Amino acid sequence: MKEYAFGIDLGGTTAKVGLFTTSGALLEKWEVPTDTSNAGEHILENLADAIHAKMAEKEITSEQVEGVGIGVPGPVLDSRVVPIICANLGGWGERNVSAQLSGLLDGMKVLVGNDANVAALGEIWMGTAKGCRSAVMVTLGTGVGGGVIVNGKVIDGAHGAGGEIGHITVNRHETAACGCGKHGCLEQYSSATGVVRCMKKLLDENPDADCVLRGKDFEAKDVFDAARSGDALAAREVDEMTDTLGMALATIANTTDPEMFLIGGGVARAGDVLFDPLVEHFKTYAFKSCRETPIKAASLGNDAGIYGAVRLIVEE
């Protein structure tokens, strides 16, 4: 094993890049703007330039670098983005990211994974789930992302769509469409935007109910804060949200039986007001032998992606 490795978490606005030792020590991290012009044609060139510049700065040679891991916001199969457009990367279509980036890096080894799966891999390597062989990570942000690790390996699936937890159907009677085009996806209820949408719906359906959020612009954090303070309508929304999420996690537990669930993203910062009812609802729906599966907050935060990307390289 060589001395260094690079990890990249590619997002629509910036790419987070980390220089690591191959034992997992983060030496330095920085960001590279994501150039989405011309259908994202310059994204990989810019990343290669950034890595070359850092190697020159640190006097690191190619012979000292084990490789580069990269998490991308789209389905990945066999180190290749499958033919689904990544809209937040300027409309990236099918491309062999591994081969293209490797070519720009003078033949350096490059491995690619879905960003949510890679973040889960980071948590199981150096985060909350360190020491676990199997874990499921659910990220509650603008959407709901997911990563499934079984026996230390990312489950990409036959079509690169493994871990699309946010698009589990939890309400077949929903009339509003999810961003994916389906109806009744978990993301519509348990993401930050979903919590706000459902809270607004509750306010409309209960015009006479007192609520500190009525008549205000609010975010998901405000809903959880109101519930913590004893607001009955906000508490009802949190109960419904955690019931839906608990049912989805129980479905996953009943099929993959992980050692641990990890909850990340901005919503996870709600703390006990989220986790306490979530655990109780999960136990209601889970198969008996899975009911005590721990549900914990992820710990690596925004660095999970770069840790997991490096893990792709060093576990090879």
Where are these regions (language model features)?
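Adenylate-forming
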Residues: 120-125, 146-148, 167-168
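Short beta-strand segments
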Residues: 9, 69-73, 113, 137-143, ...
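Structural signature of FAD isoalloxazine-binding scaffolds in flavoprotein oxidoreductases
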Residues: 161-165
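ATP-binding/phosphotransfer module of carbohydrate and carboxylate kinases, centering on a glycine-rich
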Residues: 1-67, 76-82, 99-108, 122-132, ...
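Short, acidic/small-residue loops that bind anionic groups at enzyme active sites
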Residues: 93-100, 166, 170
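A glycine-rich, Thr/Ser-enriched phosphate-binding loop motif common to dinucleotide/cofactor-binding enzymes
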Residues: 112-121
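A charged helix-plus-loop insertion that forms the helical arch/lid used to bind
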Residues: 81-93
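Short hydrophobic alpha-helix segments
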Residues: 30-32, 87, 158
